[in-house]
């Protein structure tokens, strides 16, 4: 509740002020309490453990929440040494991290969670998903992370596992200046990595135009004749196109530089006759390299072996540079304790530049000791987000403490991925002795170039107002509000090949693409097999590679929060959402629709639904309470889930297509939690949860052709269920001996089970929704032999997850250390088809050490060791390694100064 409650759970005036400053909360509680009693605070000297000091505020917030939530503060994130929101959230009870970007809450995939920035909807730079990659948010800008696991009417109804609210740092209470510098080294970088020339601005995380398509090339792509031209196209024209591309992409082996980072923050609060003004400005920069050994396979079957094996297999080195920078500028104004305005501006930028040099086995092409293959690919990607958020908080004591809050935001997310390269070299041997290397001598093979662009724009605004009522032994707050957002996305992908058959044989020899496509070669008429250069290009861009999408959400909600005799708290309400979404694909290299207007209208999502929620809290005493939450929510199809065009998922590199008849999933959620907050700061919570899912959205593999990537279909299963138990605790060791109270143990364990029934049953002569969608995609009469397991666990679900942290804070306050352990149980990544078992990611044991030394009140030296065990990450199928990556141990050292 937003208004002050003189109850056993009421916060003290000091705590209210601290919480309001820390989390940018509405000032309703603090203002109402300040009206009751003003205190003069002189000097307070606090002595205590750093962990309990940092966790106390967030625990008190969790205790006073009406709904089940877990909260992680900035100091807790700093203590674990995690560099971004995604890494930090894997420490939260029941959460697992997938691909370093997306969070699975209680085993439900990323589509089952939603992300907000300061309680506002934000865009995503991912071309295939609406959910925001959480690695985009550096820990330097985060004040706290709130994961609400039970639905409340004032949050989006697109809710499955949970809602992640990233709350950024707000205006400081006093002058602040902080600077931090650091460096790190990864043991995997002891091996040399592979590099190419790139652009002059790569250190800034930006391409300077080196990788971009030239105007002459884009003009050719959109012309009536197309990339290949017509019968009148000349050799000179095709030469100009070839030479306009960046061919300075030959790789070489070099040593890797250590990572470096720095951040600066400055802020202040100024009192004046017309109110209080505040400002906080911060910038951060990080540049790091990682060299890892990778293996991957595709096309599981019996080709080339007696039992099962992969027809294609890769094994080699991946070198990746990541450059991240962020900037924030927050402005605040308080007219008085009842009226507050805050403007938050955030800029986030993340560049990834990856080179892979891998040995490539193809059962159809490789002959060991005679003809062997090597594959080189380059992937460059920039992701960024810009967000401006304005919000106001207003209290009216003269109107019985009526309050009114509002917000408005403009955000844009961009993704730019120019100059992608994929080339296969053939190594020739004579009696096992290496003789030469050339472009693969197969007529159908291409050198692939790819260029992707995405813009995602979001406008959002909302408001809520409430009125508290006080009576004999009860308190009641009524609250209404509205949330409104509009999102528009434009994305394009240009893909084409330079054919090996279009190049004369003598020019295909060499092991470096820069040498083969040197100007001296491409300007030579003999380089081309045709006198006019025809056949040199293969346009791989397809219908739907360029698309536009939009959605609009209008929502209103009503909530009542009833508090009786300081013992019972009943919070409930209903949310109504009117949701519209459309995705339109274009024909290749044109602005003409891929589908007819009737077909587009058939896949428009237009839903308006009520979503109820009820939360009951029984407060046994000042330390213990029980919660019960029941709600109904939905999970809607993503932007491309209804398109029949294949697209490449940049995370898995799989080809994915949707189902035009895809429906929203309906969820019934039940949560029960016991919480015990002890006066010493120790705490324990035990939670039971259950979810029933109607029409869960799953993926099934269709087929893979030759060496092509697997093809996946997004479809509705018939039903799904998820249930489990979560335990979360924090205790010091003072119960053993008083001298041991400076050491503590915290952690959480989640045990759960899930099931999904796809709905395949040929015997009933009635097609389920899943069967209909799969038959339409395969153009088949039966699909009973396609899927291996009609009933299985949910994709991405781990049956158990554990986090443990052992820490010590010295009595003199100079030293602090933590050992942090994280592990998850095996989880299905790709469901099995055609008799092959499901592909599972194996458990990964992560062990980190963080030590901090505080020479004085202003300084901090931080030393981290991450991934001490150095375990290999693996996805296995039928006992074979579908994907594997060797990980190193990272050592980092940083120094910060603050006053």
Residue map of PLM features:
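Outer membrane beta-barrel strand-and-loop segments of large Gram-negative receptors
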Residues: 454, 462-464, 513, 517, ...
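Conserved C-terminal beta-signal and adjacent last beta-strands/turns
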Residues: 445-454, 461-470, 475-479, 614, ...
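Gram-negative outer-membrane beta-barrel transporters
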Residues: 683, 688-692, 709-827
């Amino acid at each position: 509740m937003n208004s002050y409650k003189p109850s056993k759970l009421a916060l003290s005036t000091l705590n209210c002020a601290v919480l309001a400053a820390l989390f940018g909360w509405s000032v309703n509680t603090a203002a109402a309490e300040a009206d009751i009693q003003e205190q003069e605070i002189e000097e307070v000297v606090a002595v205590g453990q750093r962990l309990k000091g940092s966790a106390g505020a967030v625990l008190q917030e969790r205790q006073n929440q009406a709904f089940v939530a877990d909260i992680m503060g900035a100091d807790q994130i700093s203590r674990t040494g995690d560099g971004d929101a995604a890494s930090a959230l894997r420490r939260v009870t029941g959460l697992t991290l997938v691909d370093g970007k997306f969070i699975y809450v209680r085993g439900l995939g990323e589509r089952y969670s939603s992300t907000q920035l300061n309680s506002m909807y934000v865009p995503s730079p991912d071309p295939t998903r609406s959910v925001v990659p959480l690695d985009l948010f550096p820990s330097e800008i985060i004040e706290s992370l709130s994961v609400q696991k039970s639905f409340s009417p004032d949050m989006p109804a697109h809710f499955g596992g949970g809602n992640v609210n990233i709350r950024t740092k707000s205006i400081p209470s006093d002058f602040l200046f902080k600077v931090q510098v650091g460096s790190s080294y990864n043991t995997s970088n002891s091996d040399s990595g592979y590099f190419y020339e790139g652009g002059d601005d790569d250190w800034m995380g930006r391409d300077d135009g080196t990788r971009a398509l030239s105007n002459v090339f884009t003009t050719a792509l959109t012309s009536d004749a197309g990339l290949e031209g017509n019968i009148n196209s000349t050799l000179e024209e095709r030469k100009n196109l070839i030479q306009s591309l960046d061919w300075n992409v030959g790789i070489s082996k070099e040593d890797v530089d250590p990572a470096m980072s720095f951040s600066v923050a400055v802020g202040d609060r100024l009192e004046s006759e017309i109110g209080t003004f505040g400002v906080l400005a911060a910038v951060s920069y990080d540049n790091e390299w990682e060299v890892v050994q990778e293996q991957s396979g595709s096309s599981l079957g019996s080709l080339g072996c007696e039992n099962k094996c992969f027809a294609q297999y890769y094994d080699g080195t991946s070198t990746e540079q990541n450059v991240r920078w962020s900037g924030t500028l927050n402005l605040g104004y308080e007219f008085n304790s009842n009226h507050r305005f805050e403007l938050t501006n955030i800029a986030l930028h993340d560049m990834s530049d990856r080179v892979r040099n891998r040995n490539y086995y193809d059962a159809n092409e490789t002959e060991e000791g005679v003809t062997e293959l090597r594959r080189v690919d380059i992937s460059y990607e920039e992701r960024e987000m810009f967000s401006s958020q304005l919000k106001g908080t207003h209290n009216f004591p003269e109107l019985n403490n009526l309050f009114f809050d509002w917000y408005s935001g403009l955000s844009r997310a961009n993704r730019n991925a120019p100059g992608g390269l994929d080339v296969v070299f053939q190594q020739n041997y004579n009696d096992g002795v290496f003789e030469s290397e050339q472009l693969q001598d197969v007529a159908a093979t291409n050198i692939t170039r790819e260029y992707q662009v995405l813009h995602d724009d979001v406008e959002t605004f909302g408001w809520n107002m409430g009125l508290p009522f006080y009576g004999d032994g009860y308190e009641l707050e009524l609250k209404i509000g509205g949330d409104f957002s509009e999102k528009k996305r434009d994305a394009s992908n240009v893909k084409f090949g330079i054919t090996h058959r279009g190049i004369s044989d003598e020019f295909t020899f060499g092991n470096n693409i820069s040498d083969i496509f040197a100007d001296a070669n491409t300007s030579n008429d003999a380089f081309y097999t045709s006198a006019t250069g025809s056949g040199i290009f293969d346009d791989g861009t397809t219908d739907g590679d360029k698309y536009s999408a939009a959605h609009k959400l209008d929502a209103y909600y009503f909530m009542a929060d009833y508090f009786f005799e300081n013992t019972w708290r009943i919070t409930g309400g209903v949310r109504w959402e009117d949701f519209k979404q459309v995705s339109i694909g274009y024909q290749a290299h044109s602005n003409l629709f891929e589908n007819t207007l009737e077909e587009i209208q058939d896949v428009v999502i237009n839903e308006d639904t009520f979503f109820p929620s009820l939360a009951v809290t029984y407060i046994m005493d000042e330390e213990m309470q029980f919660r019960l939450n029941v709600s109904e929510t939905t999970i809607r199809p993503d932007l491309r889930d209804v398109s029949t065009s294949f697209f490449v998922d940049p995370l898995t590199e799989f080809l994915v297509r949707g189902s035009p008849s895809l429906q929203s999933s309906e969820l019934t959620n039940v949560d029960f939690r016991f919480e015990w907050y002890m006066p010493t700061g120790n705490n324990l919570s035990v939670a039971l949860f259950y979810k029933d899912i109607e029409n869960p959205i799953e993926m099934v593999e269709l087929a893979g052709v030759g060496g092509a990537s697997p093809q996946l279909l997004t479809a509705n299963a018939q039903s799904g269920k998820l249930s489990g138990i979560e335990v979360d605790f924090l205790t010091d060791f003072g119960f053993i001996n008083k001298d041991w109270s400076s050491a503590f143990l915290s952690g959480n364990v989640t045990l759960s089970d899930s099931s999904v029934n796809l709905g395949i049953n040929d015997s009933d002569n009635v097609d389920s929704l899943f069967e209909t969608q799969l038959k339409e995609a395969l153009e088949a009469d039966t699909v009973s032999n396609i899927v291996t397991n009609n009933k299985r666990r949910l994709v991405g679900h781990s049956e158990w997850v554990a986090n443990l942290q052992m820490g010590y804070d010295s009595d003199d306050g100079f030293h602090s250390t933590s050992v942090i352990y994280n592990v998850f149980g095996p989880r299905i990544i790709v469901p099995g088809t055609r008799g092959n078992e499901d592909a599972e990611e194996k458990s990964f044991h992560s062990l980190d050490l963080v030590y901090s030394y505080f020479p004085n009140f202003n300084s901090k030296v931080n030393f981290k060791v991450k991934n001490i065990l150095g375990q290999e990450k693996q996805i296995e199928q039928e006992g074979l390694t579908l994907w594997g990556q060797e990980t190193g141990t990272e050592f980092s050292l940083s120094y910060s100064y603050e006053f």
